[in-house]
Amino acid sequence: EPEITSEQILDKISTFDIIIVRSRTTITKEMIDKADNCKIIARVGVGLDNVDQEAAKAKNIRVINAVEGAMNAVAELVLGLMLSLARQTARGDRAIRNGEWLKKELKGTELRGKYLGIIGLGNIGKRLGRLARALNMNIIGYDGVPIEEEFSREVGLMKADLDTLLQSSDYVSIHVPLLDSTHHLLDAQKMSTMKKTAKIINTSRGGVVDEDALYNAIKNGTLGGAALDVFEKEPAIGTKLAELDNVILTPHIGAQTKEAQSLAANVIAEKIIQILRGVI
């Protein structure tokens, strides 16, 4: 039932054995407390912040997601956003639509040889690292958990703490969940340590970046630009970041490809089958 409301879920949830959701539906503790027959809650996507995982754990309900489905789609979006920031293609498009020809003004830069800092080297972060390495970018990585040595060797990863990564990178791409520990991970103080030409790309969760601090840093010229696919409040209609020429905004489309949607559905179906068979 794709259009089911929260009230309808509360009325019916006691009869569900398996709950499958995308990003629109939030599964709360109140719902889970009534889910007496539920064995699995499956998120067809990456983030699990719309599922109360602690409540599910307390009732021995398995919570699964399909990060494999979005891995390539999100990484490709980040790469496209970096290219657009580097060459100012979004600004050029807007200018032509407004009757302006900014050929001389839009002098870009190349990604080749630039330093890409990746915060969070899970499946998506690693996929991005491989794509960026193919463009001869230098990859700096930070994660709160150990980074796979095989991947590090493959892309020539330079491991660093967060402060060093921010100080050294020309582009910073964020791939972490939104937790208390990652809320405003990039705030005004962190941004002040970055290169004035550096650019931030966030396709993870909006609250990871302090949008007010980001706006001020870019407007004041202490940061080079940003591309955001996620926002602290969505839909982000009316965000003041839209005032800035060197900011690109997209409406949370990281996993919105035909291939990713199909793959995520297949991944979830296979995981559910394996759980029911006792394989995983």
Model-predicted segments: where are they?
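An N-terminal-biased, well-structured beta-alpha scaffold segment characteristic
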Residues: 1-64, 167, 187-189, 193
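Short beta->alpha connector loops at strand-helix junctions that form conserved
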Residues: 1-2, 44-45, 60-72, 162-163, ...
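Short glycine-/small-residue-rich Rossmann-like dinucleotide-binding loops
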Residues: 3, 24, 46, 170, ...
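Short, Asp-centered acidic motifs that coordinate Mg2+ and/or phosphate
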Residues: 17-20, 38-40, 171, 199, ...
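Residue-level detector of alpha-helix initiation sites
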Residues: 26, 47-50, 69-70, 100, ...
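Rossmann-like dinucleotide-binding domain for NAD(H)/NADP(H)
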Residues: 59, 63-64, 149, 183, ...
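Phosphate-binding beta-alpha-beta segment of Rossmann-like dinucleotide-binding domains, i.e.
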Residues: 59-61, 66-115, 130, 134, ...
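Rossmann-like dinucleotide/phosphate-binding beta-alpha-beta segment
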Residues: 104-196
